[in-house]
């Protein structure tokens, strides 16, 4: 597997781009209502700071998605710390090289990455946001708007990472 490391910073832009459409146009009024804010409240603070912080968090999400959407990482996770892997001439290194030559591109599609990004959102993001929302006495609309945003972000990011990293 040859990695194109510039893909991760590119994928990290997704939450900013999707957020502009999601919270700026599609669900702006619903979102403002569920968080108890007005448009005037949004004018306070720096948009640049919000963009930069969202980008940093997007980087964290992108790096976290790599082992989720690229199954080939499982082989290396299982063999982490095995000394034979460090020796490029060892039988293990040769076996891994053969394995990666044959199967290194299996399941490396946008569709597969988007699937795992969506599943990650449904099975980790949804429960986390829902738990907090219930304690904060937020509505189901609050959960739906925020989980929907993150599900789309993780699907797109997962697809980008799986296909092109």
Enumerate the predicted regions with their spans.
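Juxtamembrane/disordered regions of integral membrane proteins
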Residues: 1-165
